[in-house]
């Protein structure tokens, strides 16, 4: 996949970024280099290789100490919403920002 200068400028416009032409050309080169690297990685045959959730386990003989997924504090919605400027039916009311 290769991007064009037009693609980079369009993406910058959609992201609401001001991108001068010199920077756009540099960004184009960087993005195309990145996509080239991704294509190289996708070309590698990984059949039979299990995914690594924690790669450090492959080089060190230690078990990662992950905490248990347990509730550590109670959430009291009323306490949090007490300081909100506007709440209705348990939801925060905010001004409309998109038409």
From Swiss-Prot:
Classification via Gene3D superfamilies: Glu-tRNAGln amidotransferase C subunit, N-terminal domain
Protein origin, superkingdom: Bacteria
Name recorded for this polypeptide: Aspartyl/glutamyl-tRNA(Asn/Gln) amidotransferase subunit C
Function: Allows the formation of correctly charged Asn-tRNA(Asn) or Gln-tRNA(Gln) through the transamidation of misacylated Asp-tRNA(Asn) or Glu-tRNA(Gln) in organisms which lack either or both of asparaginyl-tRNA or glutaminyl-tRNA synthetases. The reaction takes place in the presence of glutamine and ATP through an activated phospho-Asp-tRNA(Asn) or phospho-Glu-tRNA(Gln).
UniProt-recorded Gene Ontology molecular function terms: asparaginyl-tRNA synthase (glutamine-hydrolyzing) activity; ATP binding; glutaminyl-tRNA synthase (glutamine-hydrolyzing) activity
Native source species: Paraburkholderia phymatum (strain DSM 17167 / CIP 108236 / LMG 21445 / STM815) (Burkholderia phymatum)
Any Pfam family: GatC
One GO term (biological process): glutaminyl-tRNAGln biosynthesis via transamidation
